[in-house]
């Protein structure tokens, strides 16, 4: 009887060890991720990637749209599944916003509508091709002092701006900065069938001399990220944050 108990114990331990070994190997090397992200940044500042044509007439609107469709077709052929579309550029945007003016990249005239909604169009075309569209939001830099974005912010929220070198930036230490950026991200999430919000330049300017501790600086940036996260998730919990 003791021999049988001993044999059963050995078999049991061997089974556990084998299972643990298989689990250890297979957990990381053989089980593929549910969905691999293959993403590209689609840059709109200065029309770097798109648009190449300014939209201000029916003909140029269609040409601008076709440029994007051609790009998305190429990305689809390259097996991309996620497009990070630069949506907030430098205190300016590529959709009709209650907070910030139009960027000049779409119409050729800063502050002016191109005659259609580029963000809505991009989302629809991405989804037609089975690709996600994430709004790429440049967070802290807002461009040169005489730019459309800084002028708008100077008029509405001068307390949120600081000048470093030749550029203007939002003040990360201000709670109102976190709220302002969160409002933009909430607006996008509420109004569009967006798949994600992608925060860029979510940091202090590289050339800025901090007069606070690095720990406090990290906390200030974390406050912005958390405020944006909470605002987005309150609207649509499934929208991704990156």
Segments from the language model and where they lie:
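Bacterial Sec-dependent N-terminal signal peptides
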Residues: 1-22
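Active-site-adjacent "subsite" loops/lids of carbohydrate-active enzymes
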Residues: 35-37, 43-66, 124, 134-191
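Aromatic- and glycine-enriched glycan-recognition loops and surfaces
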Residues: 57-78, 105-129, 219-223
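Catalytic domains of carbohydrate-active enzymes, especially glycoside hydrolases
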Residues: 66-92, 191-194
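Aromatic-lined carbohydrate-binding/catalytic grooves of carbohydrate-active enzymes
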Residues: 78-114
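Aromatic- and acidic-residue-enriched segments that line the glycan-binding/catalytic groove
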Residues: 93-108, 141-165, 202, 207-216
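Active-site neighborhood of glycoside hydrolase catalytic domains
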Residues: 183-186, 190-242
